[in-house]
Amino acid sequence: MHGIAVIELKGYREWTESLGPRREHIIQQIQAKLHATLWKSFTTVGALPHHFRYDFFIALVNNISSAAVESAVAKIARHSPVPIDFCIGTGDTPYSAYLNCRGKEVEATSFSIVAHMDIVNSTKTTKLNGPLDVYSHIVRLIDTLLDVCKEYGCLVFYLGGDNTALFLPTPDVINEIVRNIDTRVRVGVGVAKKPYNAFVKATRGLDYLRSTNREGIKIVK
């Protein structure tokens, strides 16, 4: 079973509106602090988070105790302008675990499988056409991946640049995902007990493909 934690900033929209129309610089600074705390607190316990919508955060929490998740959430709460709540869901896939997110005492024991994907030749394209061209490409790619992931049970998130992260149900699923997109990509896939270790392995696989100037998939177990 895979585990997903969803963290909610309750009353966040109302808080933003209370700041008045000259508020966006305040909101962005608060979001940056919460983002930094999210990554520090969750990766410290071995989980893999993402800022998601900023009023909601998400994390892969396979083999992370509910107590450790609660402790990470508490650290974020210290910097939040509104109360924070969370749930943990489990399922046969990361996507089903997300849909099942209700309780707080649930723990998942499956190995974590994470992919780190980038677009082939994005650096060259950026030099030729500027950063907006690659940015628009990655937005379209993520839109496609979101639809594909619903079918295969994965979750996808934008990391910045031309990089995306995917929480996968099995290592082999990445083959089907790549077949369903029309973009040349490199993908490192990591398998480990804890999610952040899986992501580190995925990045190692991606770095190997980059250093050898290859595209395709590299699985690191």
Swiss-Prot record:
Signal peptide: none annotated. GO terms for molecular function: GTP binding; GTP cyclohydrolase IIa activity. Keywords: GTP-binding, Hydrolase, Nucleotide-binding. It catalyses: GTP + 3 H2O = 2-amino-5-formylamino-6-(5-phospho-D-ribosylamino)pyrimidin-4(3H)-one + 2 phosphate + 2 H(+). It is an enzyme of class 3 (hydrolase). One of its GO terms (biological process) is biosynthetic process. Its EC number is 3.5.4.29. It comes from the Archaea. Belongs to the archaeal-type GTP cyclohydrolase family. Catalyzes the formation of 2-amino-5-formylamino-6-ribofuranosylamino-4(3H)-pyrimidinone ribonucleotide monophosphate and inorganic phosphate from GTP. Also has an independent pyrophosphate phosphohydrolase activity. This is GTP cyclohydrolase III.
